[in-house]
Amino acid sequence: MSLLDWFADRRKTAPALRPTPEPDEGDGLWSKCPECGEVVYRKDLIANASVCASCGYHHRIHSEERLRILLDPGSFIPVDGELSPTDPLAFKDRRAYADRLRDSQRQTGLRDAVVCGTGTIEGQGIALAVMDFRFMGGSMGSVVGEKITRLIETATEQQLPVLVVCASGGARMQEGMLSLMQMAKISGALERHRSRKLLYIPLLTHPTTGGVTASFAMLGDLILAEPKALIGFAGRRVIEQTLREKLPDNFQTAEYLQDHGFVDAIIPRTQLRSRLASLLQMHQQPAAVSA
């Protein structure tokens, strides 16, 4: 049997992968916390930044809610919102990539997995990109990379700090090398931004993995994370099989990374806006000259 025949036979016999089920969050009026089981009135949950008041569990939120939580009301100005991905490789696995894109666009109302623009946090200007895990797992394709790169370049020209809210499964395999190229492209734009002594803050949310972790998620001047966020490159099972040893229970969590020096601060979502405003203000102030 040839290698190609072996792969063809494996496709026929391999069991379909089951997607990880989303937590049961109710029918729109009530939401059940997957951590403590508390049933909460959804309006109260949203008013608390989608954080469980009983146990502090951070529910997954979409890009629109993230912008509402972080920015001053009415201050957001979208950038490059018209960019849409194509299918340059005519990629098809169990389904055509073009079909997956159409489904994600219809279900989320987004063109791709990131929303970019400028706004203000307590009156201070900022350029920000918010990744949305609902769109193909927040995967980074050519359009995601292009939008983030353009945003950073705009911020460099306008002397603005940059905030990227990361929520991604990594590079988008359906775009092959075009997806992997975005890691270097975004990193290059960040280096030019850094050379102008401008502030860059990545906010790592659950989950941040793969090529996003291996590039712009870990290049910040200050690296922030939400509590208990999953942050890593390869999956836990792959690492355990490679090392042939059991990993700690809290491995690849925000707390584990902070203990090992990879995350500067873990900030609850309810405090993010005020803490970011303080950081922006401190960065804008000239360094004090001691007498």
UniProtKB/Swiss-Prot annotation:
Gene: accD
Organism: Synechococcus sp. (strain RCC307)
GO terms assigned for molecular function: acetyl-CoA carboxylase activity; ATP binding; carboxyl- or carbamoyltransferase activity; zinc ion binding
Family the entry assigns: Belongs to the AccD/PCCB family.
Gene3D superfamilies (UniProt xref): 2-enoyl-CoA Hydratase, Chain A, domain 1
EC main group: transferase
Subcellular location(s) of the protein: Cytoplasm
Function, as annotated: Component of the acetyl coenzyme A carboxylase (ACC) complex. Biotin carboxylase (BC) catalyzes the carboxylation of biotin on its carrier protein (BCCP) and then the CO(2) group is transferred by the transcarboxylase to acetyl-CoA to form malonyl-CoA.
GO biological process: fatty acid biosynthetic process; malonyl-CoA biosynthetic process
Species lineage: Bacteria, Bacillati, Cyanobacteriota, Cyanophyceae, Synechococcales
Protein name: Acetyl-coenzyme A carboxylase carboxyl transferase subunit beta
Cofactor needs: Zn(2+)
Domain CoA carboxyltransferase N-terminal as annotated: residue spans: 29-291
Annotated keywords: ATP-binding, Cytoplasm, Fatty acid biosynthesis, Fatty acid metabolism, Lipid biosynthesis, Lipid metabolism, Metal-binding, Nucleotide-binding, Transferase, Zinc, Zinc-finger
PROSITE patterns reported in the protein's UniProt record: COA_CT_NTER (PS50980)
Catalytic activity: N(6)-carboxybiotinyl-L-lysyl-[protein] + acetyl-CoA = N(6)-biotinyl-L-lysyl-[protein] + malonyl-CoA
Bound cofactor: record note: Binds 1 zinc ion per subunit.
Any Gene Ontology CC annotation: acetyl-CoA carboxylase complex
Subunit (UniProt): Acetyl-CoA carboxylase is a heterohexamer composed of biotin carboxyl carrier protein (AccB), biotin carboxylase (AccC) and two subunits each of ACCase subunit alpha (AccA) and ACCase subunit beta (AccD).
Zinc fingers (C4-type) by residue: 33-55
The UniProt record lists the keyword ATP-binding: yes
EC number of this enzyme: 2.1.3.15
Pathway(s) per entry: Lipid metabolism; malonyl-CoA biosynthesis; malonyl-CoA from acetyl-CoA: step 1/1
Annotated binding of Zn(2+), by residue: 33, 36, 52, 55
